[in-house]
């Protein structure tokens, strides 16, 4: 398995855990909203994982802590991807 796929799978697993736990609540709400537009739960989770991965990259590049408010704002923009 390639490193990129391993990383992608890790972010997807994180999103699935967040959906199951409801923490943060914006992740489950975004999944539900995307599914209401016709996406499958898997497709919605993949889109959320892309946003999470991009936000984590930005966090590292800027040497800052995770910003949940910023993450929530990015989720609101889905299905448009960053």
Range-by-range predicted roles:
Residues 1-82:
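Structure-specific DNA junction-binding interface
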